[in-house]
Amino acid sequence: MIGNEEHLGYDNTPDLEGDVMDAPICIDDLEQKMLSQEQVECPVFHHFGPGVYMREAIFPAGSIGLGHKHKHDHLCILLKGKLAILIDGEISIIEAPFTYTAKAGRKIWYALEDSSFMNILPTTETDVDKIEEIFVEKSDHFLNFEEEAKRLISSVNLEEHL
């Protein structure tokens, strides 16, 4: 997925057998590997209410995702589907409907089914870029990936391809 979206994903089926947390996971290495793979389209929808922002992302079955680092604890709801997700250092299988409070930090998940996942953040801000500045921290790997994608897109002369 390219752009200002929160979630990165690529097609790959992990081995969920046994204790997948036996070896420490290096998030930076995982993210760098994920960004080198073909990206999966994960649509994001923005919902606003009085004092609340809700960010809904759609994850296709078979995709792996890694979210940006959240600066604060926040509410999450799995609206549809089934995910294997890292919660409090353990892989949990969650199935919709499922609500929990996510601690500050990053989420890693594997979509076992087509899924719809929502982060809920307390804010009156309605500018998504400003909301991201307030609530998430993007890694250097992602910022470099995003910059390179924008550079490649801007270098394409569409008139040549028409």
Where are these regions (language model features)?
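Structural motif
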Residues: 75, 82, 106-108, 114-116
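A short, N-terminal "cap"/entry segment at the start of jelly-roll beta-barrel domains
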Residues: 1-56, 88, 145-162
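Short acidic-glycine-tyrosine-enriched beta hairpin
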Residues: 84-108
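Short hydrophobic/aromatic-rich beta-strand segments that constitute the beta-sheet cores
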Residues: 55, 66, 85-86, 102, ...
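Conserved short histidine dyad/triad with adjacent acidic residue
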Residues: 53-70
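Double-stranded beta-helix
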Residues: 112-162
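Glycine- and acidic-residue-biased ligand/ion/polar-headgroup-sensing regions
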Residues: 70-89
